[in-house]
Swiss-Prot record:
InterPro entries: ATP_PFK, PFKA, Phosphofructokinase_dom, PKF_sf
Gene3D superfamilies per record: 3.40.50.450
Calcium recorded as keyword: no
Subcellular location: Cytoplasm
Active-site feature positions: 48
Disulfide bridge map: none
SUPFAM superfamilies named in the record: Phosphofructokinase
PANTHER family, alphabetized: ATP-DEPENDENT 6-PHOSPHOFRUCTOKINASE 1 (PTHR45770)
Protein name (database record): ATP-dependent 6-phosphofructokinase
Catalysis: reaction(s): beta-D-fructose 6-phosphate + ATP = beta-D-fructose 1,6-bisphosphate + ADP + H(+)
Keywords, sorted A to Z: Allosteric enzyme, ATP-binding, Cytoplasm, Glycolysis, Kinase, Magnesium, Metal-binding, Nucleotide-binding, Transferase
GO CC terms in record: cytoplasm
Gene giving rise to this polypeptide: PFK
Site feature (Important for substrate specificity) residues: 19
């Protein structure tokens, strides 16, 4: 996407696990470098439950219940 294209966005939502969240940081750094005023919100969702800042991720409980 070009900088002109990104100007239509005010917010970006990223849904996923720890790898996705690391990617969101890279996107955030690029927005910052380009001085784009776009908010990024990370929504944790994974089966591994390995995202450090939360107790349980969406998807984890479903995986546990399905395995039982």
């Amino acid at each position: 996407f070009s900088r002109k294209t990104w100007r239509i966005f005010l917010q970006v939502y990223v849904i996923g696990g720890d790898g996705t969240m690391r990617g969101a940081v890279v996107i955030f750094e690029e927005f910052k470098r380009c001085r784009l005023r776009i908010s990024i919100t990370g929504i944790p969702k994974n089966l591994d439950n390995d995202i450090e800042i939360i107790d349980k991720a969406f998807g984890f409980q479903t995986a546990v219940e399905s395995a039982q």
